[in-house]
Amino acid sequence: MIKNKFMALTLTVALTAGMLSGCGSSEKAKDRDAYRQYGINCIENGSYDDAVDAFQKALDQSVGSVGAEELDICYYKAKAQYLSGDVDGAIDTYTAIIDYNKDSDAYYLRGCIYFAKNDSDKGMKDFKTALSENDDNYELYLGVYETLSKYGMNDQGKEYLDKALKLKAKTADDYMQRGRIYTMLGDYDSAIKSLQKAIDEKLVKANYYMGEAYQKQGDNDSSQKYFKKYLDSGEADSYDLMNMGQAQMDNGNYDTAITYFQTALDLESVPNKQQITKAMIIAYEYSGDFATAKSQMEEYMKEYPDDEDAAREYQFLETR
């Protein structure tokens, strides 16, 4: 995941017009943080319009200079805008961040949205700018590859992976990211060697990617061994657990997949709750437990009534 980076700079006129503003009194800071948390909760529950409103109210609490908290809220606001269908609003928010501090993450994320709008020229321009601002960031190269691959530009995406491999690994995280790249390129031996270096340096997250490399290689036993190590560490987030569950789905291990999905839903923070809940329902269905699948789908439809695909799936489950 691309990580937010923040810079303490002077506020521009465009941002003071309401997009961004700074920290105020301690009371306003508490209100800001409360609105921020409420917005995050709304995203987790699929209430994206409410999330946008909450993040804007959080920003409205600020008076003075911009800090990391305000920029963090703007990133959340842009995410909520995109998820709500307000693509242009999300672009405007990322543009405001870019105008403020030229952050490479904002360029990258705006580029992703341009690709979603079928504007690959603007998307590529933003990707190139992001990498020019931060050309030693493995995660940026990986993100660019994944986006290009998603939109049918796999060969161009691989060029960015090759560029990333020309960087010199200096840290355990670097070795882990290189392992991810080798996995994407199908060079599993190199991936395992690189990931082992990261594991030897006590980077727990590398166990997850080691499990992924073995899973891609078809070695499910070794994959489970490393996934379990990562799960036992307590560091797995809901995205990791969903991916581990999906890997088990691919191998037909539906009960294990359900365990991963449920573990994810039991976490304190589950920003991808809707996707996990839906995946778990499918896992129950594939396992043959149609009664549980139907029961959970009923609860899902109450929480996410606008999901038309789920409504069609529910009609199918009613016939089982």
Model-derived segments and spans:
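C-terminal motif of bacterial Sec signal peptides marking the signal peptidase cleavage site
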Residues: 19-22
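Start-of-helix register in tetratricopeptide repeats
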Residues: 33, 67-72, 105, 139, ...
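Canonical tetratricopeptide repeat
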Residues: 37, 69-72, 76, 83, ...
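Register position in tetratricopeptide repeats
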Residues: 44-45, 83, 116-117, 150-151, ...
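Canonical positions in the second alpha-helix
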Residues: 58, 96-97, 129-130, 163-165, ...
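Structural marker of alpha-solenoid helical repeat scaffolds
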Residues: 61, 65, 99-100, 133, ...
